[in-house]
Curated annotation (Swiss-Prot):
InterPro entries: C-type_lectin-like (IPR001304), C-type_lectin-like/link_sf (IPR016186), CTDL_fold (IPR016187), NKG2/CD94_NK_receptors (IPR050919), NKR-like_CTLD (IPR033992). Phosphorylated. Residues 94-233 are extracellular. Immune inhibitory receptor involved in self-nonself discrimination. In complex with KLRD1 on cytotoxic and regulatory lymphocyte subsets, recognizes non-classical major histocompatibility (MHC) class Ib molecule MHC-E loaded with self-peptides derived from the signal sequence of classical MHC class Ia molecules. Enables cytotoxic cells to monitor the expression of MHC class I molecules in healthy cells and to tolerate self. This is NKG2-A/NKG2-B type II integral membrane protein. Its main location: membrane. A motif (Immunoreceptor tyrosine-based inhibition motif (ITIM)) lies at residues 6-11, 38-43. GO terms for cellular component: external side of plasma membrane; plasma membrane.
């Protein structure tokens, strides 16, 4: 028991004064480490500043180099727009001119075919003549009498220009041309020889003439067809 008590007292001895005197050395070492860390931090800051300046110069150079590329892209864009405009011009303008020409021709014919004060309202006028646009169908002889009752004559054709006008506004009609037989010439109701070509059919009894969109044709006089009348001013 006494031996154990001695050991216990030895373990509870106060600290060695020499060990306490060694603490300032530890503080000096800490100060040195702190100075080294500060120096290292300053070096890192200088390096970071240099890297930032270098990156700024590099980005500035990139901006300077991208300017010509932007210029080239702009020029290419303008060229594309010019090419597109040229294509549109080549395609659109000819069709527009053609349409204007057709409209001009139609307007000219329409102006010539306006209602005239000398003609009834249901009639149209063209080149000093009034035209009745019929809707009912009659034989050639009946059509001739119907036009006479309207103080006019069955549709007649005086020249090529008039025939073009009539084929533009009419689908078909009897005209004042007939013949006695297939062995006789075509004549008008005034007894004048008809100068325009009439396309013959295979039927010998087709001795009356009709106006169609595709030209003049012979037809059977007894068949019912649409007729139109003409009155010269």
């Amino acid at each position: 028991m006494d031996n154990q008590g001695v050991i216990y007292s030895d373990l509870n001895l106060p600290p060695n004064p020499k060990r306490q005197q060694q603490k300032p050395k530890g503080n000096t070492s800490s100060i040195l480490v702190t100075e080294q860390e500060i120096t290292y931090a300053e070096l890192n800051l200088q390096k970071t500043s240099q890297d930032f300046q270098g990156n700024d110069k590099t980005n500035h150079c990139k901006d300077l180099l991208s300017a010509p590329e932007k210029l080239i892209a702009g020029i290419l864009g303008i060229i594309c727009l010019v090419l597109m405009a040229s294509v549109v011009t080549i395609v659109v303008i000819p069709s527009t001119l053609t349409q204007k020409h057709n409209n001009s021709s139609l307007n000219t014919r329409t102006q010539k075919a306006r209602h005239c004060g000398h003609c009834p309202e249901e009639w149209i006028t063209y080149s000093n003549s009034c035209y009745y646009i019929g809707k009912e169908k009659r034989t050639w002889a009946e059509s001739l009498l119907a036009c006479t009752s309207k103080n006019s004559s069955l549709l007649s054709i005086d020249n090529e220009e008039e025939m073009k006008f009539l084929t533009a506004i009419l689908t078909s009609s009897w005209i004042d041309v007939f013949r006695d037989s297939s062995h006789h010439p075509w004549v008008t109701i005034n007894g004048l020889t008809f100068k325009h070509e009439i396309k013959e059919s295979d039927h010998a009894e087709h001795n009356c003439a009709m106006l169609h969109v595709r030209g003049l044709f012979s037809d059977e006089c007894g068949s019912s067809k649409i007729y139109h009348c003409k009155h010269k001013l």
